[in-house]
Amino acid sequence: MKLVLIRHGQSEWNKLNLFTGWHDVDLSQEGVVEAMTAGKRIKEAGLEFDVAFTSVLTRAIKTLNYVLEESDQMWVPVHKSWRLNERHYGALQGLNKQETAEKYGADQVQKWRRSYDTLPPLLEENDERQAKNDRRYQLLDTHAIPAGENLKVTLERVIPYWMDTIAPEIKEGRRVVIAAHGNSLRALVKFLEGIGDDEIMDLEIPTGVPLVYELNDDLKPVNKYYLDK
């Protein structure tokens, strides 16, 4: 069984080196090219899908659309869930990463970005960036909407969705592609591969490059490779 993961193509805020999180930004032109290239590589590799999953953020949705279009699979059913959203960067969202490092120190910012259990500064209740002000989350219990997340909290929302919704599809023999974000995918990869809390700090997932897992009957990885050529 094969599972394909893809981080969205470069976004406008990736390009500007800003913390993005749940803020909804579009793909940059380079990100569009990355997504289209990913779709072409998937087609060349002969990978076919029966069902697709993505977040409710534009950059991931558009990446998936380009992938399906370029691989001639636009008809594949797509399921969108906030549980596949990027990690919520709290009060860091919209800030420049370099300027934040100069203000708080590179080590502190690295912990905020890569540590498993260090929370970023949280959004204030009345901050206009609060996701509760976004219509796409209007059906969620307000207590479920974060004001900031670390990777641990991100994993705690991603993995139940994997277990309850995505994994059963794979076990039924359906071929799955997931287009999501750097940290929601890091959380899933941590779970699939059993990566330790400290080791996960070093894991980087590139934008717009399909990651193919070959899974056994227990959905444990037996092989993985990037379609980067």
From Swiss-Prot:
InterPro entries: His_Pase_superF_clade-1, His_PPase_superfam, PG/BPGM_mutase_AS, Phosphogly_mut1. GO terms for molecular function: phosphoglycerate mutase activity. The keyword Isomerase applies. The keyword Ligase does not apply. It is an enzyme of class 5 (isomerase). The active site is at residues 8, 86. Substrate binds at residues 7-14, 20-21, 59, 86-89, 97, 113-114, 182-183. The record marks 181 as: Transition state stabilizer. Keywords: Gluconeogenesis, Glycolysis, Isomerase. Disulfide bonds: none annotated. It catalyses: (2R)-2-phosphoglycerate = (2R)-3-phosphoglycerate. SMART domains: PGAM. GO terms for biological process: gluconeogenesis; glycolytic process. It comes from the Bacteria. Its EC number is 5.4.2.11. HAMAP family: PGAM_GpmA. Belongs to the phosphoglycerate mutase family. BPG-dependent PGAM subfamily. Catalyzes the interconversion of 2-phosphoglycerate and 3-phosphoglycerate. This is 2,3-bisphosphoglycerate-dependent phosphoglycerate mutase.
